[in-house]
């Protein structure tokens, strides 16, 4: 079974982000290693959402990669520059050097993709 390291946020309300990634990748026979980049009370399109501070995606991913190698890496929503920097460092690391890498622009394309 191939392993995929998934960086994305998770929301308590709103079936999107990590909640949508896991069943899709699992259906395709991949072993999922989810790494939350942010934890929200609800999807950010709802008014009044709140976010848990200081989600350490980089440290979380390093622990997972110490036990299992990644054949692929999926990068979804990163809510701040520190998280994006940690993910970038991991993508450059030897632990993910040979892994396929997929980056989802999460609407960063202004609707042009």
Cite the ranges covered by each PLM segment:
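Conserved beta-alpha-beta core of the PfkB/ribokinase-like small-molecule kinase fold
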Residues: 72-113
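Small-residue (G/A/S/T)-rich helix-start motifs and N-terminal tracts that mark the onset
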Residues: 1-71
């Amino acid at each position: 079974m191939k392993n995929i390291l998934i960086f994305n946020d998770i929301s308590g309300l709103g079936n999107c982000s990590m909640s949508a990634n896991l069943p899709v990748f699992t259906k395709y026979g991949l072993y999922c290693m989810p790494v939350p980049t942010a934890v929200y009370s609800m999807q950010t399109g709802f008014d009044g959402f709140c976010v848990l501070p200081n989600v350490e995606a980089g440290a979380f991913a390093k622990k997972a990669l110490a036990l299992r190698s990644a054949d692929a890496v999926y990068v979804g929503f990163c809510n701040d520059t520190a998280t994006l920097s940690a993910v970038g460092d991991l993508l450059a690391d030897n632990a993910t050097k040979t892994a396929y890498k997929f980056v989802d622009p999460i609407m960063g394309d202004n609707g042009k993709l």
